[in-house]
C-alpha cells in the first residue's frame, strides 16, 4: 500500500511538523509512505491513500486544505477548531465572501451577520475572542473520508458536528528523551510553563496564583518559556504582582535541545489554556516522557489525563484559588510530586509508545484504503451490470443510478 502524506515538516516552526518528523520513520518501517512536497496539490502516481495533517495554522496548513479539496482522503485532525485556518484561507486572501459563506454554513443567518461585523471591523475578529463558538471545521469534515484524532474530546465534537465517517482515536506519540543535561534555574521547587505567553494560556491567572504561593514559599520559582503574544504586556503584569525580579525566570523561543534541558530542570509542569481548540499538547507529552507531574486546565484532551499524573484546574470563578491550592500542594509535598512523576512516566511508556502509535496508524491506513477499495469494487460491479442491460452512460437511468449510489456514499 502506497500512502501519500501531506504535512508540514521541519524546519517549519510547527508542533505538527515536529509530530510528523517523530512519527514518519516508524510509519515507513511498516508501510510505503511518501511525504508530499510542500505546496503540491496532487499525490504521486500509484498512491493508494492520501493522508492530510490539518491544524489551525493557515501558513502551515493552507496548502494542505487546498490539496484535500482536490483529493478527499484520511484527515489527521490535530485541532478541532479551525476558525483561524479558515480566516487565513478567506479573509487572508481577500475572499470575504468565502468567510461569510463559512460562517453561514455553521451559524446560519446569525453567523453571516457576525461575519459581516468582523469584515466591517465593528467587532473584534472571532478567531481571536470567540473561536470555540464557531469552529468552522465543516468543510474539512465534509472532505474527510475518515478521521484520525488524538482525543475523545475531538471524536465527540466531530460526531456532534454530524460527521458520519469512520474515526480512529490514536494517542499522540511520546517523544524520545534526548541525553541533554538539566540546566541550573533558580527555584525550589521550580514550576515551568512552555509555549506562547498570552491570556489563552491562562498566564494572568498563573502569575496571580504564583505570587500568592511565593508569599508562603519564597524559595519557589516560575519559569516562563516562549514568546509573548503581541499586545500581551507581560512586564506590566509582573511589576503589578511584584514578580519582576522575584522568583520568575523568562526565556523566549528556544531550540529543541534547550527546550529539553529547561523542561528537565522543572519540578512541576503547568499546561493551562482556555479556550481549547481541541489540541493535544506536545509539551505536555514531553513532560510525561520526562516523568514530571502536571497541572492542567480541566478542558478538552487535558481533562482525559489520569488524575494520578495531572492536577486539573476548572476554568471558573475559583480558578486562581484552585491553582494556588494545586501549586501549594506540590510545593510542600515532594512525595506527591514523585508519585505523580512515576505515574506520568508509566503513562508515556504504556499509552504513548511510538511503536504502539505507529501500529494504530497503519491499522487505520489499511481500513481506510480497504474501504475505498470496496467502494471501487462496488462501482465496477454496478457499471458492468448496467452495461449488460443496455444502460448507456449519460442516460436518465445512469443518472438515477449515480444519484442512488451517492446517497449511500458511493461514487463522485
Give, region by region, the residue ranges found by the protein language model:
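A short, active-site helix/loop in glycosyltransferases that binds the activated sugar's phosphate group
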Residues: 125-166, 174-176
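Acidic donor-binding loop of glycosyltransferase active sites
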Residues: 145, 263-278, 292-293
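Nucleotide-activated donor-binding/catalytic signature segment of Leloir-type glycosyltransferases, i.e.
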Residues: 234-257
Amino acid at each position: 500500500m502506497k500512502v501519500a502524506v501531506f504535512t508540514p515538516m521541519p524546519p517549519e516552526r510547527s508542533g505538527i511538523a515536529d509530530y510528523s518528523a517523530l512519527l514518519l520513520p516508524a510509519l515507513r518501517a511498516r508501510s510505503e509512505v511518501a511525504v508530499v512536497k510542500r505546496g503540491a496539490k496532487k499525490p504521486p502516481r500509484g498512491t493508494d491513500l492520501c493522508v492530510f495533517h490539518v491544524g489551525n495554522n493557515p501558513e502551515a496548513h493552507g496548502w494542505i486544505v487546498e490539496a484535500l479539496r482536490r483529493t478527499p482522503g484520511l484527515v489527521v485532525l490535530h485541532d478541532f477548531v479551525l476558525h483561524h485556518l479558515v480566516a487565513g484561507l478567506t479573509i487572508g486572501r481577500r475572499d470575504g465572501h468565502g468567510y461569510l459563506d463559512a460562517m453561514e454554513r455553521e451559524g446560519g443567518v446569525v453567523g453571516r451577520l457576525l461575519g459581516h461585523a468582523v469584515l466591517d471591523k465593528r467587532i473584534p475578529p472571532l478567531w481571536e475572542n470567540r473561536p470555540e463558538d464557531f469552529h468552522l471545521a465543516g468543510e474539512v469534515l465534509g472532505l474527510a473520508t475518515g478521521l484520525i484524532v488524538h482525543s475523545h474530546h475531538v471524536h465527540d465534537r466531530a460526531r456532534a458536528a454530524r460527521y458520519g465517517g469512520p474515526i480512529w482515536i490514536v494517542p499522540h506519540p511520546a517523544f524520545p528523551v534526548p541525553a541533554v543535561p538539566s540546566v541550573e534555574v533558580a527555584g525550589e521547587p521550580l514550576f515551568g510553563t512552555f509555549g506562547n505567553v498570552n491570556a489563552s494560556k491562562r498566564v494572568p491567572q498563573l502569575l496571580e496564583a504564583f505570587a500568592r504561593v511565593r508569599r508562603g514559599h519564597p524559595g519557589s520559582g516560575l519559569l516562563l518559556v516562549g514568546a509573548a503574544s503581541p499586545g500581551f504586556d507581560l512586564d506590566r503584569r509582573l511589576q503589578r504582582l511584584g514578580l519582576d525580579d522575584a522568583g520568575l525566570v523568562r526565556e523566549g523561543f528556544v531550540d529543541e535541545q534547550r527546550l529539553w534541558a529547561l523542561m528537565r530542570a522543572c519540578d512541576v509542569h503547568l499546561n493551562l489554556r482556555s479556550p481549547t481548540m481541541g489540541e493535544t499538547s506536545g509539551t505536555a507529552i514531553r513532560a510525561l516522557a520526562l516523568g514530571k507531574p502536571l497541572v492542567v486546565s480541566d478542558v478538552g484532551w487535558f481533562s482525559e489525563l489520569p488524575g494520578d499524573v495531572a492536577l486539573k484546574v476548572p476554568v471558573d470563578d475559583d480558578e486562581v484559588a484552585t491553582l494556588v491550592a494545586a501549586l501549594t500542594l506540590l510545593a510542600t509535598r515532594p512525595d506527591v510530586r514523585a508519585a505523580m512523576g512515576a505515574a506520568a512516566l508509566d503513562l508515556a511508556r504504556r499509552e504513548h509508545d511510538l511503536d504502539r502509535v505507529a501500529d494504530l496508524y497503519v491499522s487505520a491506513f489499511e481500513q481506510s484504503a480497504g474501504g475505498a477499495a470496496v467502494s471501487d469494487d462496488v462501482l465496477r460491479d454496478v457499471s458492468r451490470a448496467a452495461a449488460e442491460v443496455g444502460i448507456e452512460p449519460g442516460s436518465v437511468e445512469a443518472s438515477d443510478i449515480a444519484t442512488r449510489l451517492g446517497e449511500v456514499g458511493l461514487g463522485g
